[in-house]
């Protein structure tokens, strides 16, 4: 099981139209966990049952495009993608929030590491 985050972006649309499309998408896709939106972008989080990460990435890259007609989504493109395994996703949810980048060039131990 993979936890996928897709960010899409494109030409400005009424934010209410984007929200309505995401609501339709959530009815079509039971694995959709959450979505955020604005007039020029949206971010989706969902579970994927692909056998391997390559399958999850491939599916994620076509996810928005494949649902454009059925959910009446904006003609936006994927501009960001993250796929992590179930253990990584769950670990992130239970650990305190920490800035992704503290300083450029910084090298630090990962949270939950066994140093």
Regions found by a protein language model. Give the residues of each.
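Long, contiguous binding/interaction regions
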Residues: 1-115
